[in-house]
Each structure stands twice: as structure tokens, then as C-alpha cells.
Amino acid sequence: NIPLLTLVDVPGFLPGVEQEHGGIIRSGAKLLYAYSEATVPRVCVVIRKAYGGAYIVMDSMGLGADKLFAWPSAEIAVMGAEGAVDVIHRKELKDSDNPEELKQKFVDEYNDKFSNPDIAAKLGLVDKIIKPSETRKVVTEAFKELVNKTNVGDKHGNIPL
């Protein structure tokens, strides 16, 4: 019956054969399973990067976090701006006379449109954007609100091994 506090700064799962052979999928599945089966109060604070599937596994709203807060510095998106711009605007960058300047323009646009915490809050993916100095107070209040969270009793699932 110990509540869970998750501080998120995850740049995503690194793609590659080495990570796959190292068991990243299995490890991610185990963490996903543990969070989804947890019946204790769960509070999550995104402090910096929260990208893609790795963020989802780190107790996102989609996974059922009871409360989710984000610092103003949080970046919540499918992937980082640089990587997204390389994929989305590959042709324009290749054909540009000044690719660095154009890339920076696209990165700034991506950050404004997709990866800032205000967008996540508007979409209901974040309960509140908080200042770093407020974190202790806000988290404490959240756990006080959740003190009577009903325990659903024993659950028996099939953990991914």
C-alpha cells in the first residue's frame, strides 16, 4: 500500500538491434504491466522529456495515472523535435539552400505546436502545469486527495516474462 510517485525524463526507446537483443521490449512490457496492475495511488510529474512509447510506459494518463503534473520545461510528444523534423521535412531540408536555418525554423514550429506542456494540458493529458518549486506541495496535496483510493483487492494477471 505504498503510493507511487514517478518523475519522468525519458527521451524514448532507442531503436536498434542491440536494444532489442538487450531485452528493452521485455523490460518495457514488465514496467507497463506493473503500473497497469498497481492499485495504490499513482502520481506522475513530467520534469523534462516524455517521448513516445517510453513515456506511455512511465505512468502516463493513458496508463491510468491518478494525477499527472508537468513542469513548464516538459516536452510531451511522440518524439523529439529534431528527430521529428528530420522525418517530416526530409525533402524540404534536402532541397534547401540553407538547411540549418530551415531546420531550426521547423524545430521551433514543432515545439510550439506539439511538444509543450500547454498542448498536453489542453488535450487532458496533464492535470496541471506546475512550477518546479511547487512540486513537493502539489504532490503532497495529490496524495492527500488519493488517501482513500479504494483498493480493488487481489488481481491476478499474466506478467510478460
What are these regions (language model features)?
Residues N1-L161:
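Ligand-binding clefts of soluble mixed alpha/beta catalytic domains
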